[in-house]
């Protein structure tokens, strides 16, 4: 196991490992645990009662965090026609059609999210799937990044809409803000994420859905969270 420094060990002492914290308690505690010289991201990690080997039990969805994530999201929009002006007006950072596809294929990656209109998806899939797919950036209707409403997609991403999905071990990792956030805003974002997760529970998943949860900052120790029984089948 890797050895932690004195700073980290001192932070661990502030967390009661025999306690499960309420979200309000944890949101207040992260203020004490975030001691890095930058504004640390606050994340939550949920272990789900699913079998990730079964495709019908995988969890994926999006949620609009009421107080955003605290980070600036650079959005690229692949579209054409009148949607170009709509995307620019909505605040997209880079907009284009076939020429943008070629630019990305050539190595341009100065964006954090990509959205596309349906009329561009054939070209996107053909030329960018292998490049964007492994990075989690390939536009997909399930993640709210493919559709005719360019304005809504761009504004949603800019305002703090995030995508969540389980990893191969059945755990969902998601940001809910920054350590500088007011604790009440972190709590509200957490509540929105919990609701979205429970709504995304697969019908084939049995028993307790939300098995365990932890909150952590970028450089800090994890805080065990209480779950009121979890979502049952």
UniProtKB/Swiss-Prot annotation:
GO terms for molecular function: rRNA binding; structural constituent of ribosome; tRNA binding. Keywords: Repressor, Ribonucleoprotein, Ribosomal protein, RNA-binding, rRNA-binding, Translation regulation, tRNA-binding. The keyword NADP does not apply. InterPro entries: Ribosom_uL1_bac-type, Ribosomal_uL1, Ribosomal_uL1-like, Ribosomal_uL1/biogenesis, Ribosomal_uL1_3-a/b-sand, Ribosomal_uL1_CS. GO terms for biological process: regulation of translation; translation. PROSITE patterns: RIBOSOMAL_L1. GO terms for cellular component: large ribosomal subunit. Binds directly to 23S rRNA. The L1 stalk is quite mobile in the ribosome, and is involved in E site tRNA release. Protein L1 is also a translational repressor protein, it controls the translation of the L11 operon by binding to its mRNA. HAMAP family: Ribosomal_uL1_B. Part of the 50S ribosomal subunit. Belongs to the universal ribosomal protein uL1 family. This is Large ribosomal subunit protein uL1. It comes from Deinococcus deserti (strain DSM 17065 / CIP 109153 / LMG 22923 / VCD115).
């Amino acid at each position: 196991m890797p050895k932690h420094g004195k700073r980290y060990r001192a932070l661990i002492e502030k967390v009661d490992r025999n306690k499960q914290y309420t979200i309000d308690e944890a949101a207040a505690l992260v203020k004490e645990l975030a001691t890095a010289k930058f504004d640390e991201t606050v994340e939550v990690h949920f272990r789900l009662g699913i079998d990730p080997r079964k495709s019908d039990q995988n969890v994926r969805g999006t949620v609009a965090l009421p107080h955003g994530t605290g980070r600036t999201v650079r959005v690229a929009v692949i579209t054409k026609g009148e949607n170009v002006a709509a995307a620019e007006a909505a605040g997209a950072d880079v907009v284009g059609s076939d020429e943008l596809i070629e630019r990305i294929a050539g190595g341009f990656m100065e964006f954090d999210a990509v959205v596309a209109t349906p009329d561009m998806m054939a070209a996107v899939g053909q030329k960018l799937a292998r490049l964007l797919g492994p990075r989690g950036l390939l536009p997909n209707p399930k993640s709210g990044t493919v559709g005719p409403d360019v304005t809504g997609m761009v504004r949603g991403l800019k305002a703090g809409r995030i995508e969540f999905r389980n990893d191969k071990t059945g755990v969902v990792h998601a940001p809910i803000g920054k350590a500088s956030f007011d604790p009440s805003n972190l709590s509200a974002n957490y509540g929105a994420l919990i609701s979205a997760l429970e709504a995304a529970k697969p019908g084939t998943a049995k028993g307790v859905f939300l098995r365990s949860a932890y909150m952590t900052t970028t450089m800090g120790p994890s805080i065990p969270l209480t779950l009121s029984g979890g979502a049952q089948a």
